[in-house]
């Protein structure tokens, strides 16, 4: 995890943007990405999803991508701290990425290529959390079913909050929800290949768990990405508690 930046000092020092595109993050609309990302990050912090500078959030708005900075206290982010990229943009090398606004003294998110992977498949918002429940679920799946297994759960009302795939509606109560799991890597950007493979093998998924790390969740709108992330986190916590009681996650497997 990057060393934490004292974001309050950065804010006080002002900004010196090479492109002078401050207008991109200035809006009175609370739903504007530059306002919405800080608000979402504050909520995620209170929920324990982005503790200790971990995690991140990005929103695509037309041909622009708005991204929270890396290595900062997420609950303190302000609109002027947001990076803006042109979309589409190359994932690699990082030097080729088309930033059109870079706040001074802040580092672009290490999650950037993973966010771009989600946007390339049509997502409009991608959220990365370090939820304890997501981490615990990856450990339980590995111990019970092995490293190649997905997280699977059925016959729980909350799975109806997760899409079955683009244009395929939402999961039904009796369906089995499957979330792929990839291995963690020493550096965040190195997760990109694993995420791409998981999406290729599971083209309908809206989330990928990262073992011993957290989860990436995306949606067709920022609101959908947020509510899907909430539903998944609720399901992960429930799964941990069910395991304590010896209750199966996927009733369809026991029939």
Curated annotation (Swiss-Prot):
InterPro entries: Aldolase_II/adducin_N, Aldolase_II/adducin_N_sf, MethylthioRu-1-P_deHdtase_MtnB, Salvage_MtnB_euk. Binds 1 zinc ion per subunit. Pathway: Amino-acid biosynthesis; L-methionine biosynthesis via salvage pathway; L-methionine from S-methyl-5-thio-alpha-D-ribose 1-phosphate: step 2/6. The keyword Cytoplasm applies. Keywords: Amino-acid biosynthesis, Cytoplasm, Lyase, Metal-binding, Methionine biosynthesis, Zinc. Belongs to the aldolase class II family. MtnB subfamily. Catalyzes the dehydration of methylthioribulose-1-phosphate (MTRu-1-P) into 2,3-diketo-5-methylthiopentyl-1-phosphate (DK-MTP-1-P). This is Methylthioribulose-1-phosphate dehydratase. It comes from Talaromyces stipitatus (strain ATCC 10500 / CBS 375.48 / QM 6759 / NRRL 1006) (Penicillium stipitatum). The gene is mde1.
């Amino acid at each position: 995890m990057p060393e934490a930046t004292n974001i309050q000092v950065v804010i006080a020092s002002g900004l010196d943007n090479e492109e002078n595109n401050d207008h991109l993050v200035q809006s009175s609309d609370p739903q504007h990405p530059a306002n919405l990302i800080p608000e979402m990050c504050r909520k995620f912090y209170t929920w324990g999803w982005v503790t200790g500078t971990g995690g991140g959030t990005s929103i695509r708005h037309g041909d622009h991508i708005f991204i929270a900075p890396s290595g900062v206290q997420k609950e303190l982010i302000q609109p002027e701290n947001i990076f803006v990229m042109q979309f589409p943009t190359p994932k690699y090398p990082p030097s080729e990425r088309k930033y059109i606004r870079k706040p001074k003294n802040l580092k672009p998110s290490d999650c950037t290529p993973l966010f771009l992977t989600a946007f390339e498949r049509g997502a409009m918002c991608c959220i990365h959390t370090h939820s304890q429940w997501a981490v615990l679920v990856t450990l339980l799946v590995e111990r019970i079913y092995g490293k190649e297994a997905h997280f699977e759960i059925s016959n729980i009302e909350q799975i109806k909050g997760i899409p079955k795939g683009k244009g395929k509606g939402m999961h039904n109560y009796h369906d089995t929800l499957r979330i792929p799991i990839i291995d963690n890597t020493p550096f965040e950007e190195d997760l990109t290949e694993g995420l791409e493979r998981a999406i290729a093998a599971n083209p309908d998924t809206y989330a990928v768990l990262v073992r011993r790390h957290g989860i990436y969740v995306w949606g067709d709108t920022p609101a959908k990405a947020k509510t899907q992330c909430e539903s998944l986190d609720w399901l992960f916590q429930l799964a941990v508690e069910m395991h304590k009681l010896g209750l199966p996650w996927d009733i369809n497997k026991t029939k």
